[in-house]
Amino acid sequence: MTMKNVQAFTDGSCLGNPGPGGWAAVLRCNGSERELSGGFALTTNNRMEILAVIEALALLKEPCGVDLYTDSQYVRNAVEKKWLAGWRRNGWKTSDKKPVKNRDLWERLQPLLDLHQVRFHWVRGHSGHPENERCDVLARTQASSRGLPPDTGYRE
């Protein structure tokens, strides 16, 4: 049985950093498209970037080949440059022995990366890439919403 191939486009936004934030993803598979987004009252841009990837991958109910497009060097580098593996190996400490930021989200992301075959593609933000621009609009709309829930994992 062959694995489904999915295109996932993700973005995170924060109005202030920290401040109200939003995340968004657009997924495409076999000619169909799905948009998803959410937000939090107080969070950071990096948390929203990671969460967008988590939510996109979590939507997939079976192992898939995923071409994931992000404008976040932070997320891409954490995976591709093996920072994530190093942090786990070092007891969630950075190379200078400080606690890894956003550990709660990295721990949610890892099993999804193990399940799917994810290929990261970096796109320049705000450069006219249609899907990245769409995700940006969705994420900013969420960040601007009233009555957002707290980001319980955020620590100042």
Curated annotation (Swiss-Prot):
Needed cofactors: Mg(2+)
Cystine connections: none
UniProt-annotated binding residues for Mg(2+) 2: 11, 136
UniProt remark on cofactor binding: Binds 1 Mg(2+) ion per subunit. May bind a second metal ion at a regulatory site, or after substrate binding.
Alphabetized PROSITE patterns for the sequence: RNASE_H_1 (PS50879)
GO terms (BP aspect): DNA replication, removal of RNA primer
InterPro entries: RNase_H (IPR050092), RNaseH-like_sf (IPR012337), RNaseH_domain (IPR002156), RNaseH_sf (IPR036397), RNaseHI (IPR022892)
Entry keywords, A to Z: Cytoplasm, Endonuclease, Hydrolase, Magnesium, Metal-binding, Nuclease
GO cellular component, one term: cytoplasm
One Gene Ontology term of the molecular function aspect: nucleic acid binding
Alphabetical list of SUPFAM superfamilies matching this protein: Ribonuclease H-like
Record-listed E.C. numbers: 3.1.26.4
Subunit note: Monomer.
NCBIfam families: PRK00203.1 (NF001236)
Protein name per the record: Ribonuclease H
Organism whose genome encodes this protein: Nitratidesulfovibrio vulgaris (strain DSM 19637 / Miyazaki F) (Desulfovibrio vulgaris)
Gene: rnhA
